[in-house]
Each structure stands twice: as C-alpha cells, then as structure tokens.
Amino acid sequence: MSETINTAAQFPSFEKPTVQFNEKGWGPCELPDTFKDVPYQPFSKNDRLGKICDWTNTSNNDKKYQNKYASSFGTGIQYSYYHEEDETTFHLVDTARVQKPPHQRGRFRNMRNSRSGRGRNARGGLNTHGMTTLSGKNVKARDPRHGRGMGKKFGHRGPPPKMRESSVAVRADWASIEEMDFPRLIKLSLPNIKEGVDIVTCGTLEYYDKTYDRINVKNEKPLQKIDRIVHTVTTTDDPVIRRLSKTVGNVFATDAILATIMCSTRSNYSWDIVIEKVGDKVFMDKRDHTEFDLLTVNESSVEPPTDDDSSCNSPRNLAIEATFINHNFSQQVLKTGDQEPKYKFEESNPFISEDEDIQVASVGYRYKKWELGSDIVLVARCEHDGVLQTPSGEPQFMTIKALNEWDSKLANGVEWRQKLDTQRGAVLANELRNNACKLAKWTVQAVLAGSDQLKLGYVSRINPRDHSRHVILGTQQFKPHEFATQINLSMDNAWGILRCIIDLVMKQKDGKYLIMKDPNKPIIRLYDIPDNTFDSDDSDDGEGDDEGFQQVYNYAHNKI
C-alpha cells in the first residue's frame, strides 16, 4: 500500500518579504499602524526633561524657508517645569517704582518664543538655547510663566490697566441722547466765521516787563508767589452776561468752556459741561467746585502720570501745580506797583465791588459776539492777561501762559536745562506731543479774545522731587493764528464742533443737559438730566444768586 507524504507539513515555508523602496529619499515610505497618531516631539539626549511632549506647535508647510528642516532640539525648554512657590494668585504693587530710562525699554522685543515657525526657538527660527547657556535666573526672566519680562509685557500677569474715572457719575435718571465719536467730529467744518465783535470791555491790565525776554537757562529767575485773587466765574453767574442775555445773542458761554468743546478731539481725560436751554437761548456752564479750571499735565503723553494720590506726580497734584505756576507766572512778568501805568477798559472789573479792598489779578474781559449762521449768535466772555507797549504807542494785548517741567525722566521728555537754549524747537515739539490738548485750548482762547501775542513761559522745578519751588528758564512768543497753523489746529473744525453741539441742543426741549467726554473712549455723550441736578450742591454753600459770581482762588497760598 502506497503512502503519500506531505512535505509541506514537515518543512517550514519561506515567504518573500515586501521591501519598500524610497525613490525620493531614505527611510520607510509608509508608517506602520502601530505608530500612527502617536505625538512626537523632537528631542536630544542632552536636553533636560521638562515635559513629555508638545503637539501644540503648528506645522509649517511653507517651502520658502530654507532652514525649515533645521534641528529644533531644545524647543520645549520654555515649557520646562521649575519647582518654585506658586505666585499666580497674587501680585505685588510697588508705588515707589522708578520707571526705566528710555534706552532700556524694548530690550527683549526680538526675543519672543514664537510658535509660528518664524521666531526664535521655533522651528525654522534662531535657536538661542543651542548657542548660549543661560543661567537659571535669566531663563526665569524670559519665561512667560513668571510674570516678568515678556509675560508682563504681553499682559499674562499683573494687574489690568487702570481705567480713568469719569468727571461726574452718570445717574440712573439721566437719558442718553447722542453719542459723538471723535472721527466724526474731526470731519466737521464751519468756514468763514468772522472775527468777533466787542460788546463790552471790562477790567484793568498791567504792562508786560520785557526783561523777562532775556531770561535763559544760565540766567534763570525764581518764580514768585503773587498774592492776588483770580476769579473763575461760570456763565450764568456773570452779571454782564445776565445783562446782555436780555438783548443780544442766544448762545452764551466763556472762552474756557468754548475752548474745551472746540478742542475736545484732542482730550483724553474726562470733562463735563452743563447746558441749560430756556426758550431759544442756550447757556453753557461749568459745575462749581470741580477740576474744570485745573490745567492738565502730560494728558496726551504716551506714558501719562501714574494715578497715585500720595505722590506729588499724580495727575491731580500735577494739575494743581501747573495751575499754581500758570497764574503766578502770568502776574510776575507784568510791571506791578502803584506808580506803574495800567491799561483800563471802559468798565471796571465786574466781579468786585467798589468797597472791596483786595488785590485782583491783572485781567481784561472782552464780551464778544459771533454770527454762526442760522440765526445763531454766540456771546462769550474772553480774557487778556497783559498788554505790551509797542514803539508806535499802540497797545498789543497778550495771553500769557506757562509750561512746566516736573520730572523729565518720569515724563519721558527732554532736559530743559540742556536743550532749551540750543534746541528750543525740540522742547516745544515734545510739549506739543505731551500737552496737545492744553496748548490747543490756550491757542483757541487767544484767538477768541483777539490777542496779538501768545506768550509762553518755561518753568521748571528747582529739584525734581520738590514741587513747591520753581524757576523761570525762558519765554517764547507767538502770534495766535500762526501758532494754530503750526500745531495743526483748524479753527474751521473747531467752529464746526461747537456748531454741531449747539444744533443738537437747539433741537431738544427746554431743560438741562450735560455733555461729557468718556474717560476711556474717544466719545462725547449728550445727556438729558433733571432740572434739579447739581442744585443740592449749590444750596449747601448758603450763597444766594447775587453772590454766585464771587468764586475766587488765591493761588499764592495754595498748598501744593
């Protein structure tokens, strides 16, 4: 009997394996199923272990980077774990922090740990860790987790930026009527407004002392404290405007109020103006006992003063100091004394009575009217600070103001004592950047008053830390209209903004309204407020209507 033998069961079979051939490179062409979807982080055995892997890095398929296949070992070191105390739940606030000088700012600007494949430490970028060995302290400073360096710059840690406070708290019973943003206001224009016509002139002016034109840094002069009363009277408390409102005009204001509205697009801080509409007449007022009359300092600066009331360099304390300097400077540069000649207007100062024996600041008031079209006649009180005697004998009226230097290092400015005599243009350009709104207001007030000259004084602290003693370092004068062109101030646009607000109020019913600049946005809002708003503040003072215009300030005895 024959027997069949199965050789296949006795001997192992040989199957030909499939060999992958990569024609375009080296290595396998396909990824085995075992290793699919497994994240991979490039690494080196010399790297310290920080985390398992990082798959958040986006792939870069752009072929224009020649070094995209460069080694990216060490890219995960920025995510390494450092055993330290947890500081994520709190932050320290140093009120006495000294700001870095300008040359130290932005020193880590080009050392960002970008994940886009283009920055340092990223794939295709410059690998700084492969080139430089950093100490633990330096690595910590560049680590975004620690709230210093880049982390603080990009806002990952630290307190949020402080929001500015509104000049007045908006109440629940106020109705918002209109919002006007700055881009729309900048486009307004009201051309061909003629010069104002004088209606009434009041007050007495003293003549300017030309010796102050020879002051320079090497021949500085101390700023004196002048014991004189300065009246800051609002529109409805002005007895002359009350008298004129019965026969002339239908819109009434002061030059300070008009300048605030006309230069509103340059303002950053919040302000408010109360408007009353009675029939076809509109009265623009400032609220009593507010900071409306204080001069801002570095309002338009890239780095405004820090909001710390305990510091002499806080915005409010600097405003008080600037107002103190401005009023004392405007009186010191005049020829004072009983024997010195004075320029007297037709009427006496309307804010003092004949029986009062007080020293009043040199000021001349012009009550002028302007035709704004559409039967709108504006009547406003404007001011001169001094008068200059020309060789021909004709008087030239002056608006005298003062710029003040408080701390050039903190203000990111230029040293006046080094640049004022040789590069006065650079000093003025820096002031135009930091105080654009204040200088524009002064220019508008000089134009409205019809001043022939705008005199600017440069006043600085004797010591940057002492805000009570100052010196005059120099003076400079301009023609108001030429200076307006120099600072890019368009009077057509200023009149257009004013006319826009007047038209909005004229369309409303009789009552009380308030326009306010938003403290944090470039917006002006118009509110309809109850008629008794702010009346409670006036009644507490116990002053009658006849004494309302006697609001005065004595800047010689102010404690700053």
Swiss-Prot record:
Cellular localization per UniProt: Cytoplasm
Superkingdom of source: Eukaryota
Principal subcellular localization: cytoplasm
Phosphothreonine modification, residue list: 128
Region of interest (RNA gate), ranges: 291-305
Compositionally biased residues, Basic residues: 100-121, 147-156
GO cellular component, one term: cytosol
Coiled coil: none
Subunit: Component of the eukaryotic translation initiation factor 3 (eIF-3) complex. The eIF-3 complex interacts with pix.
Family that this chain belongs to: Belongs to the eIF-3 subunit D family.
UniProt xrefs under PANTHER family: EUKARYOTIC TRANSLATION INITIATION FACTOR 3 SUBUNIT 7, EUKARYOTIC TRANSLATION INITIATION FACTOR 3 SUBUNIT D
Name of the featured protein: Eukaryotic translation initiation factor 3 subunit D-1
Species annotation: Drosophila melanogaster (Fruit fly)
Taxonomic placement: Eukaryota, Metazoa, Ecdysozoa, Arthropoda, Hexapoda
